[in-house]
């Protein structure tokens, strides 16, 4: 069963969180709406179906390949029960997930407001309105439409009692997702089930001194795969780390900016400034052969190779106690991408359990990832500190 590997933790449930705004009204749902990397719609759809099946809720997905949008329509059970169990940061391929309430076809494009108000009037109330489009239309016409609709739609929804007078977190947020000028999906979002980021995308600023754009990838991983408290716990000044396949040095550079002393392993050339940095030791070696002389806090690995090979080597690092934490990318094949991720996670789980190592493994396709997913494996005191047993 695909999903984030839960070696010491079950899928997070809403019962462990504070009272959800979902309990404040009656919302009738038709499915789930998710955004993912364009081209990964099938994997995202499968992920939603897997989560739904755990709640004995079933449905089917409508996929337009290359759009980055998945509309999973429920055919049996309540999609709200599924949505309540989702935490988007724990999804692998979905970067945003909403609970879809209404699939609205606009017949008269001179009035898009009335059909939306009529559809939503009988349901529960919302604390904020977002009108958005996940689609990249070249002329930006959908973006313009979303912008133009915001003021009249907000006013009409407020008058109808659908939208609260002032913004509030006590109620779910309403997302009107424009898939075309004639097609709007009304969806509900609460956090952390849905991402608080617009379109689920973190907007990170690339710093010119970074040796490569890959620096954004590792920054996003730390930002989105850990809560602020977890991040503070696992990433500290004075730690030591190893970067396998480090050149030209984006990941090493990022770790050094966090105060971590790094050993950068690659046959390729590291950026000159990094070579001269006293916090960096460069080793020209094979990343699949290199072994640390003593245990480190972090191993990170961005080598482009077969995912199973990378996974085995990362399992070596964790099982032989060479590192406490590992962050690495699995480059996915063109086909059977889901199977590959599943097989790799299963293998890692077997290795860690075989070595009697308690761990928490998180997997995510980040916005800055391409044909790959990022894996974060956490062992040691992290598990007791955050009660993952
Ligand atoms: C995608 S790049 C890494 C980019 C790097 N993370 C950054 O932020 O700049 C992959 C690197 O892996 C290196 N590489 C490939 N196979 C390797 C191996 N077996 N051992 C060490 N490095 C390897 C390549 O030389 C290349 O520099």
From Swiss-Prot:
Its EC number is 2.1.1.186. Residues 1-24 are annotated as: Disordered. The active site is at residue 331. S-adenosyl-L-methionine binds at residues 214, 247-250, 266, 286, 302. GO terms for molecular function: S-adenosylmethionine-dependent methyltransferase activity. Residues 1-13 have a biased composition (Polar residues). It is found in: Cytoplasm. Its main location: cytoplasm. Keywords: Cytoplasm, Methyltransferase, rRNA processing, S-adenosyl-L-methionine, Transferase. It holds the Pfam family RlmM_FDX. SUPFAM superfamilies: S-adenosyl-L-methionine-dependent methyltransferases. GO terms for cellular component: cytoplasm. It catalyses: cytidine(2498) in 23S rRNA + S-adenosyl-L-methionine = 2'-O-methylcytidine(2498) in 23S rRNA + S-adenosyl-L-homocysteine + H(+). It is an enzyme of class 2 (transferase). GO terms for biological process: methylation; rRNA processing. Catalyzes the 2'-O-methylation at nucleotide C2498 in 23S rRNA. NCBIfam families: PRK11760.1. Monomer. Belongs to the class I-like SAM-binding methyltransferase superfamily. RNA methyltransferase RlmE family. RlmM subfamily. This is Ribosomal RNA large subunit methyltransferase M. It comes from Hahella chejuensis (strain KCTC 2396).
